Amino acid sequence: MQNTSASPTIVVLAHRRADHLFQVVESLRAASGFSRHRVLGIVDGEWPDSTKVLREGLDPQLLIRVRHEGHLHPRNRIARNLQIGLDLAFSHFSSPYCIVLEDDIVVSDDFLDFVAAVHAKHAKNPLFRAVNGFSKVSPKAGALPSDYVRLNYGVGWGWALPRRSYRQVQKLLARCGDFHWDGLVEPFMRTGYVVNPLRSRVINIGFDGSGAHTGSEEHQNTGRQMASSLLGPSEWRSTSTNLRLVARDFPWRQDVVPLDALGATGRLLAYGNGVLLFLLSALRYGLRNSPVWTSLLGLRRIRRLLLRVIPRLAAQRRQEG
């Protein structure tokens, strides 16, 4: 049974980038509501500078150094570290939700309040899956601090997962193999909705090329757009009563479906497609991704067909009044 009085947990995933991590830590300490959270730091490998930044900057309840055997790809190490952090947040701290920050995600002073407000507002909705903190919508495009959208999408770049969602993705995160963690959890996220602000509550300073998968001109441009969208200091304080759901596009990727910009039929199709993707992922997990069974059952072909539906849904506009 969930302990409703337990504090939410912030999991900080760190590696060798102590300078970036310092900026993340400083932004967290300055964020409104920081004292209401437990903090768990996870350092991937022997990086004493990063360990020191976490210990002295955040004074975490738990600080763990993880050693991985063999030569794992960075995405596999990140996935395993994430699994450790989420498991401790929900099983050890009994948190109602867990916030995950990598060592290049700098937060605004409203980030923690925004996550708390969204959780309070949506936690009882059975379709609520998670909260993201990012956006690249500029104030010049009419984005207000109060506004948010519901997306049929996944999570990343400063996000929070409620306990109920973790129960559904826990086994998927434990899968062995060469997987991106966000790809493992995305099918379940698409069975409902995630919340994104129109004004960003985070920036990704890893778009300078120091990250494992960043540094291209496209990434750098995205970083600039996130910075232009970022909420300023003391510009806004989110509560469960002053946030406003808006029906509009959310420019990001072709497979991001802005649910409230669709009619009722479009939303049902998006949810239904997500359910099928999630069931397919669960089936492949149960079969341990066996090439023989995957081929015999045509699972890869079915998955490709389902994935083709998503950009078409994302391109739709409201058809019904």
Indicate where each model-derived feature is located.
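Peripheral/terminal regions associated with large enzymatic or DNA-binding modules
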Residues: 2-100, 105-321
